[in-house]
Amino acid sequence: MNPLPRHDHYIAGEWTAPAEGGYFASVNPATAEPWYEAARGTAADVDRAVGAARTAFEDPRWRDLSQTRRGRLLRNLGDLIGDHAERLARTETLDNGKLLREMRAQLAGLPEYFHYYAGLADKIQGEVIPGASRELLNYTLREPVGVVGAITPWNSPLLLTTTKLAPALAAGNTVVVKPSEHTSASLLALAPLFEEAGFPPGVVNVVTGYGPEAGGPLTEHDGVSKVTFTGSSGTGRRIARTCADRLIGCTLELGGKSPNIIFPDADLGSAAMGVIAGIFAAAGQTCVAGSRVLVHREVYDEVLERVTARAATIRIGDPLAETTELGPLAIAEQLEKVESYVELGQAEGGKVVCGGRRPETGLDGYFYSPTVFTGTDNGMRICQEEIFGPVATVMPFGSEEEALAIANDSAYGLAAGVWTRDVNRVHRMAARLEAGTVWANTYRSMSPMSPRAGFKTSGMGTEHGTEVIREYTRLKSVWINTSEEPAGDPFILRS
């Protein structure tokens, strides 16, 4: 049996073996077979990476680089990602099971993030503040915070790392990335492109490993000035506590249990497809998944029939195949979690009207059929807890007020969808839904230009758009006395 390919950490522009010599296998979720080994990072590896990032941050080659030049490097990187898109897309499909055609589309849009922040890099600026007197000049500077620790998830490794890297680098920071232990390959494939784009060594570093062994030391390291994390709300809380103890900032993009609300005047065909896209795309493994489908009683039966009819015909199988519409869940633990929630939902009184089982695919991977529940109450655990899989609950409502009450009755507040032809209703719903993103007659639309934030336990801080620059900069106020008059004795009062 041939040994698996091994990948080391990427630190200071070099492939670096793990300090303690350990490696761990990563599994292809479509086959349930290991396909490479990654370095098992420890506190010593994190310390080395943070040291490299701190050195790069203070190096004149990066510190004194003009903002315009930083923007050029980001544009170079975006172009290189476009050049390597097929390789990166295939790597991520093998690593987390997303459809290859979905990854190709994602990689086609990924350069836009770097190009957008390339254009923003030389527009990060302070302002002049009107002073108390003509002799006092007061202005502000917006400076990089320093070394950013970025901990990224397994569901969309490249995209969700890009949303952190691009603005952090545009602002002049250096970064240490700790990808999920389940999906390190695409980040390791991306890493050498930073130096090829012209970034000095150490500006971007990648340390692989498990959360407690590498992620924990990264958030606790004295050399890290800011932490950004995407993942579960439970882990996010622990990171927030660590950052609070250290008095450093953190940006958290966490879980969701998003409502997708359909009114009787909606285009029901489009709404049903919006439900399908909202919960079954990427096997439901998206933080904004529209897992709670709320349908007005007047059209409940019709919408349910449309949704279940399409869900039952979704083609499940090899994510590399062009005809496949639903790939596997990314990890074995997630498959077990989805199965346990489906069992729980039935025990709570819910009825499975579609799916609810592992499908026959001819593969040994972590596949689960698109599943639709009826007969559920919003107080049930399957309606309140994030499942992170292809499981939807379809619940009726009778009025706008009732829809809002159900939608907002959640610990989460990441996103919401509204389907209606009534533009006044759209505005009313958007104003009262407790969610950081509201979509009307669409779902899962994204752009690097549009800010994204989570309400309640769905997160803290902002990603995307111009607002995110505040997350990666600190504000400095500068006062200058321009008067040529000699300073007087401060203890003599003057009228």
Where do the model's predicted regions map?
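A short acidic/small-residue loop/turn micro-motif
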Residues: 17-19, 23-24, 40-44, 266
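Rossmann-like NAD(P) dinucleotide-binding subdomain of oxidoreductase/dehydrogenase enzymes
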Residues: 126-270, 397
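Glycine-rich loop-to-alpha-helix module at the N-terminal edge of alpha/beta enzyme cores
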Residues: 33-124
